[in-house]
Amino acid sequence: MNDIMRKLTPALAALLFTVSAAGANAKSQPVPAHDPIVQMVTSLGTVELELFPDKAPVTVKNFLNYVNSGFYNGTIFHRVIPGFMIQGGGFEPGMRLKPTRTPIRNEAGNGLRNTVGTIAMARTSDPNSATSQFFINTADNSFLDHHDDSVEGWGYAVFGKVVKGMGVVRKIEAVPTGTRGPFADVPLRDVVIKKMELAGYR
């Protein structure tokens, strides 16, 4: 099993690459000193996320900007790989890519790890290319952690965790997937983020 995972991990990491889109400006939202709770209502149930602005201030501020603007409402989980992660935050039904704001700095070196239930930013092969797309780890994916400041070792920035609704995450992880155009691992039936909003602080 370990040998199989060692062979698969580089390929799985490559699947977290995102597709670039033109930037669009939006007002920044201040990030409070305590941990925001974001409620994500999906077509398969509700998930609550606790964000860590003390560890990932740039990433949390960026994510909340998208949340507060309603950007995520109506988007889909467009990539689902059992035993790895579920990814969303960039496409509408029909695999229509949404335009995003300017990419942010990668905060993967913040000490947080890609363990089960954590949320992290997806990106292209450029470490500092994350915009709106995120993924929730459904396994302990240590190969996605920051190891060094090289392109290969930079890792994927964790900025929060699931605090309620991990069962919903598992439901999403279990949906049948297939190929849609050039995209693989796409749910055969859309899993829609109906609404994402700031629900309070912890």
Regions found by a protein language model. Give the residues of each.
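Cyclophilin-like peptidyl-prolyl cis-trans isomerases
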Residues: N2, L16-R202
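Bacterial N-terminal signal peptides that target proteins for export
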Residues: M1-L12
